[in-house]
């Protein structure tokens, strides 16, 4: 709890109204919330060292051969050549000769609860946090030590996040936005509105409220000042960052909020010390978000089914240092979509996105690897009418999509070290966490992945995971997920 609060307080370094009051309130609240009897118990420091590996730090000039990484009490304490680093006596050693060490991977945009079918919503009501935990364990198993959930049920995400932070369950470190501001919940016309006719109005209301928390479509009727009040309330709900819709979801050609309101949302997020990102699906919604001052454009490579992003706008992203989470897919997947699902809503969008991604690479945009992924229920996948394309280099399958996205960036010509940065240091910097995660330097949180093959030689080598270390402790990846609910076939699902 203390570590997460300190992270938020560091991010309140933004110069702006409310800083002294926020700090005074925050310190007082923390003092009242943690009595002396509740202080965390002292535990013996655990020291771990990885030796003999090629250490690939995304911020270093070159890989370090025969390197050593020393970790103590969850933090990196030393990184260097074997003959230059003293390993303390009694340290647990992982011999990584012939292997490669990289920072823990991340996904800038995923959904740990993405299961909007009525069967799952009904059957697991009150237990959504268990599915979030299952998802966070699938991501950790595949090297993602930190993930950023950009749309989901606030209460379930908060419960799972806090359980992982407290050591009550294994899983990737979670940061989340809760609702996409301006969107109604899953059983609405923004998502699966047609399903609402098959359940009670009470269930529809409960389900939608689990996502919305006062930030649904009603905001679009409000004045900027009224929206400001609503956003200020929402920043107190426990979310880690804000995401709003600059364009709509199902009807992707519509602009959601006016320029004035978008600026208000960004201002209030920054006032609370949070980064702010936006959902965009068109050239104009992208440009409006840039002008509003967002930190991250979510799937900003999606600009509609026809028009690519003008280079003028791409250059603006670089000039204003705005990061873009992208949804790259392999050429093989794009071919499968065009062959087996040519009438699919996203098929033409992904073709244009391919061109946008190439333009962003050329211009030097800070690109963040993302997948929009969630747990893919095996029964629903098997019954899919588009299974012929759904199963080719999947994008939205947790634990698989990020590997395919890396291969797609490689196909597009992104440099090998830049691919690594797109999953590590670029994401950390975009979320203003570069002092904690994303690189291998003393003082950083000790999140590492050990690979059996060199990722700089081929993107497929990211799959060759030998070990995952999170918070300075080796993860039992073979045991994950510990209690699968919907990711595997069982008699009751």
What are these regions (language model features)?
Residues 61-102:
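Histidine-rich, glycine-flanked metal-binding segment
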Residues 124-125, 244-363, 368-370, 374-378, ...:
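Active-site core of metal-dependent hydrolases
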Residues 271, 354-454:
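His/Asp/Glu-enriched, well-ordered alpha-helical/loop segment
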Residues 23-35:
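Bacterial N-terminal signal peptides
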Residues 99-166, 184-188, 281, 286-287, ...:
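Metal-associated gating/positioning segment near the N- to mid-region
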Residues 132-156, 171-180, 238-250, 275, ...:
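Divalent metal-dependent hydrolysis catalytic cores, especially in the metallo-beta-lactamase
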Residues 119-130, 207-226:
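Active-site mouth loops of central-metabolism enzymes
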Residues 55-68, 81-84, 308, 416-420, ...:
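Acidic, glycine-enriched loop/beta-strand segments at the rims
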């Amino acid at each position: 709890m203390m570590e997460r609060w300190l992270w938020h307080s560091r991010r309140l370094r933004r110069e702006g109204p409310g800083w002294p009051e926020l700090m005074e309130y925050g310190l007082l609240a923390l003092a009242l919330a943690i009595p002396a009897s509740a202080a965390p118990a002292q535990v013996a420091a655990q020291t771990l060292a990885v030796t003999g590996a090629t250490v690939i730090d995304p911020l270093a000039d070159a890989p370090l051969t025969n390197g050593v990484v020393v970790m103590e009490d969850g933090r990196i304490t030393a990184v260097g050549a074997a003959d230059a680093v003293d390993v303390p006596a009694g340290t647990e050693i992982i011999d990584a000769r012939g292997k490669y060490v990289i920072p823990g991977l991340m996904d800038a945009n995923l959904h740990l609860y993405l299961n909007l079918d009525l069967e799952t919503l009904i059957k697991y009501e009150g237990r959504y946090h268990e599915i979030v935990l299952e998802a966070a364990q699938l991501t950790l198993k595949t090297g993602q030590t930190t993930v950023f959930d950009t749309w989901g049920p606030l209460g379930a995400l908060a419960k799972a996040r806090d359980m992982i932070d407290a050591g009550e369950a294994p899983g990737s470190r979670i940061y989340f936005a809760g609702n996409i501001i301006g969107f109604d919940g899953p059983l609405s016309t923004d998502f699966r509105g047609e399903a609402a006719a098959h359940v009670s109005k009470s269930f529809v209301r409960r389900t939608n409220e689990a996502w919305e928390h006062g930030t649904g479509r009603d905001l679009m009727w409000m004045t900027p000042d009224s929206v400001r009040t609503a956003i200020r309330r929402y920043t107190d709900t426990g979310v880690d960052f804000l995401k709003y819709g600059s364009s709509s979801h199902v009807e992707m050609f519509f602009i959601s909020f006016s320029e004035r309101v978008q600026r208000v949302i960004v201002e209030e997020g920054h006032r609370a010390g949070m980064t702010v990102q936006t959902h965009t699906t068109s050239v104009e919604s992208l440009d409006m978000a840039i002008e509003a001052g967002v930190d991250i454009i979510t799937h900003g490579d999606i600009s509609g089914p026809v028009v690519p992003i003008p280079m003028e706008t791409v250059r603006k992203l670089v000039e204003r240092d705005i990061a873009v989470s992208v949804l790259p897919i392999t050429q093989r997947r794009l071919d499968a979509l065009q062959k087996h699902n040519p009438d699919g809503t996203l098929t033409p969008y992904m073709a244009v996105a391919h061109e946008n991604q190439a333009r962003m690479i050329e211009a030097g945009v800070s690109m963040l690897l993302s997948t929009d992924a969630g747990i893919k229920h095996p029964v629903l996948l098997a019954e899919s009418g588009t299974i012929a394309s759904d199963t080719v280099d999947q994008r939205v399958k947790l634990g698989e999509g990020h590997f395919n996205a890396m291969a797609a960036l490689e196909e597009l010509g992104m440099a090998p070290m830049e691919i690594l940065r797109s999953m590590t240091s670029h994401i950390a910097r975009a979320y203003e966490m570069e002092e904690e995660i994303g690189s291998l330097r003393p003082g950083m949180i000790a999140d590492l992945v050990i690979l059996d093959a060199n990722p700089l030689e081929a993107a497929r080598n990211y799959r060759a995971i030998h070990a995952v270390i999170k918070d300075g402790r080796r993860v039992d990846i073979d045991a994950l997920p510990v209690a699968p609910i919907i990711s595997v076939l069982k008699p009751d699902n």
